[in-house]
Amino acid sequence: MSVDVKSEFSENDSSSSSSSPTNVNNVAWPNYQMMPFMNAQPLRDKMLQPSFDPQLYGRWPQMGEAGFYGHSDIYSTFALPQLSTNGQILPTAEVVEVKPPLSNGSSSSDSGMYPSPNDLTPFPSTSSGIGASSSSSDLQAAAAAAANYQMRAATCYQQSVWPFMDYQQPFPWKMPLGSAGKERRASSDTKSLPTGPGTNNVRVRTADKYRMVYSDYQRLELEKEFHTSAFITSDRKSQLSTMLSLTERQIKIWFQNRRAKDRRDKQKIRL
């Protein structure tokens, strides 16, 4: 059995060797998708287009080598002003035409895509005297008006903004109390200061503080409330503040002083 099998293999080898040699590339491989490296598909066939067209992917025309767009009709001519020795602008009739260099890919047919400068309404000039038709008197008047405007603007700025930003002068409330400070303070004390609510138009000065003087009606209402309760609640305090035109702090201090006075009176009675 083993001999017969060997003979069969030998016959197959001899038949394969006797056949004519074939080219590997010409063989139609059934598993071409599994072995793409044998005969790779060109990358050009996979692209949507054989070459990159910038006009297809860009909305606007591409810039040329010199950095300008390839349409000369969108550039208009302008005049360059000249300066005299004293710095004034003189009228000039020389018109300098600036046109960008055309790129290799630009053509005359592209000019229809853009309107010509003659069809467009020019913007009004913001300065007088730049065009070629301006006279020297107009230029001088414009220069004088500009200089006058700058001087007025600088003066207005100094008068309005600079006094508030002058930090070199010290603030009056930061200065030490010297002789000048004492005189200024004495002069301010002599002024008639408005009295607060419920002061009965009287202010009694004790050292550097002012003591509140209650009116008869305010003292009567506070005394009645104290005999009702020696400790006032916050709700009642707000009600008395509205009724007597006093602050809650003034009412609180009055009750504290009234309780202290009541304790002293009780101690005197015990003694």
Swiss-Prot record:
Record keyword Protein transport present: no
Location of the DNA-binding region in this protein: 207-266
Comp. bias intervals (Low complexity): 100-117, 125-135
Region Disordered, residue ranges: 1-25, 100-135, 178-202
One cellular component (GO) term of this entry: nucleus
Comp. bias (Polar residues): 189-202
Gene Ontology molecular functions: DNA binding; DNA-binding transcription factor activity, RNA polymerase II-specific
Pfam families in alphabetical order: Homeodomain
Localization in the cell: Nucleus; Chromosome, Centromere, Kinetochore; Chromosome
Record keywords: Activator, Centromere, Chromosome, Developmental protein, DNA-binding, Homeobox, Kinetochore, Nucleus, Transcription, Transcription regulation
InterPro entries hit by this protein: Caudal_homeobox, HD, Homeobox_CS, Homeodomain-like_sf
Transcription as UniProt keyword: yes
Top-rank taxon: Eukaryota
PANTHER family per record: HOMEOBOX PROTEIN CDX, HOMEOTIC PROTEIN CAUDAL
Subunit annotation: Interacts with tir-1 and let-756.
Similarity comment text for this entry: Belongs to the Caudal homeobox family.
Function summary: Transcriptional activator. Interacts with promoter regions for tbx-8.9, tbx-9, elt-1, hnd-1, scrt-1, and vab-7 genes. Binds the sequence ATTTATGAC. Binds to the enhancer region of the hlh-1 gene promoter during embryonic body wall muscle development. Activates the gene for mab-5 in embryo development. Necessary for vab-7 expression in C blastomeres in the posterior of embryos. Required for posterior V6 neuroectoblast cell fate specification during postembryonic neurogenesis (patterning) which generates the characteristic ray lineage during male tail development.
Record-given protein name: Homeobox protein pal-1
Source organism (scientific name): Caenorhabditis briggsae
Gene: pal-1
